Amino acid sequence: MSNIYIQEPPSNGKVLLKTTAGEIDIELWSKEAPKACRNFVQLCLEGYYDNTIFHRVVPEFIIQGGDPTGTGTGGESVFGKPFRDEFHSRLRFNRRGLVAMANAGPHDNGSQFFFTLGRADELNNKHTIFGKVTGDTIYNILRLAEVDIGEDERPVNPHKIKCTEVLFNPFDDIIPRIDKKTKKDEEEEGKKSKAKGTKNFNLLSFGEEAEEDEEEVNEVSKVMRGKSKSSHDLLKDDPRLSSVPAVEREKDSQSADSDKDEDEMSDDDDEEEDDEMDSDEKHQMKDRISNKLRKDPSKSIKQAENSDEAEERKSSRSEELRREARQLKRELKAAKEKKENNIKESETAKEAENTVANSALEEYLKEKEKYEEVRKKNTNKGVSREQQTLALLDRFKSKLTQAITEPPKEEEASDVDEENDKGWLSHVLQFEEKSGKVKDANMQDEDTFEIYDPRNPVNKRRREESKKIMKQKKERR
């Protein structure tokens, strides 16, 4: 791995992808591939990759994603058109965990990208490498590849990108675009919210009571339409309200007929009162509903929590089932391969045994046929059988005498056949002669020479002893 740190340039930029298989930490080479990195960072800032799937998985090769349509043919760059490839001499497809742009040909880069799962020298100078996966998140890439693959290298249950997060932006001048589609969607949602909606009381826990209250209000509004309304009109059964009006109305029809201006003013006042009473009715309805909701708000919270927990359980259960299915598939595949290997080994062993047995059986049958033929020829019994035996003995004697009289031929050992070798007939047993002379046991051979080393301590002692003896002889003289 040390050659990777030496050859690859330093990174500048960091993006985090949150997928269903875990987080993936990507470091960018923004100096070596500026266009590809700018395109990738801006798309991440705009949330372009959110909820997109990894639509292509090739085991031990690549994992491809970044297409919002999920077909492998969609996606566009932030420049509005495909941008050129960016190759660098220090960036090669020599390991797993590299991030590169996917394209359909030269200079045809859009929004799709892929991760490498191993060495891919055939992709060099064809795809732009702009990042690498760092840390332990590289194991999450391997989890992305652990899916069942169907036709056209598409996974059966593909993983997807939940969201993206730019941890370090190397381009300070990037401004996320406002998508036209989102603007239209917002306008349509605004129009829908302004339109009058139908009330669905079945969604409420107290739907029947709310529906009855709504019917009562509608009936009262029909009866009191065009008249001024007060709390006396709506709440007739309330004992706290007096039935006597606070101000008595003066029935003066003459003044009303004479003064048209006053009538117009009174009409305006009535309309204002009607509007006020409509607003009062709405407030009262809201208060009733809010009071009923306040009675037991914990139920709705518990229901929401239970629904969230149920969804989490379903998702976790589905993931566990997928894992178990993959594990079971692997075990079945391994058991099948093991069974096939055992069958092959047993077949080869049987074939070898059969060949050995067949060869031995053939030799045995040949020998048996040979002796059977000899036995059939020698079917005579009695005197004829004795004469035949004597004839064989005479033939053997003549062979011996001939071998003794003829001088032995000197042949090489390799040329002589063991079965046809007749040298043993003329062989003479001879023993090695031992001399009766007595030899010195210390002498191994007559030609043996004694090696005398003056430095040997034994020889030194002998010299000293001989010197002493010579001195003693001289003194005696």
Swiss-Prot record:
GO terms for molecular function: peptidyl-prolyl cis-trans isomerase activity. Pfam families: Pro_isomerase (PF00160). Residues 203-355, 401-477 are annotated as: Disordered. The keyword Phosphoprotein applies. One of its GO terms (biological process) is protein folding. It comes from the Eukaryota. GO terms for cellular component: catalytic step 2 spliceosome; U2-type precatalytic spliceosome. Residues 11-166 form the PPIase cyclophilin-type domain. Gene3D superfamilies: Cyclophilin-like. The keyword Phosphoprotein applies. It is found in: Nucleus. Residues 230-240, 247-258, 280-299, 311-353, 430-442 have a biased composition (Basic and acidic residues). Keywords: Coiled coil, Nucleus, Phosphoprotein. Residues 308-381 form a coiled coil. PROSITE patterns: CSA_PPIASE_1, CSA_PPIASE_2. Residues 208-218, 259-279 have a biased composition (Acidic residues). Part of the activated spliceosome B/catalytic step 1 spliceosome, one of the forms of the spliceosome which has a well-formed active site but still cannot catalyze the branching reaction and is composed at least of 52 proteins, the U2, U5 and U6 snRNAs and the pre-mRNA. Recruited during early steps of activated spliceosome B maturation, it is probably one of the first proteins released from this complex as he matures to the spliceosome C complex. Component of the minor spliceosome, which splices U12-type introns. Belongs to the cyclophilin-type PPIase family. As part of the spliceosome, plays a role in pre-mRNA splicing. Probable inactive PPIase with no peptidyl-prolyl cis-trans isomerase activity. This is Spliceosome-associated protein CWC27 homolog. It comes from Xenopus laevis.
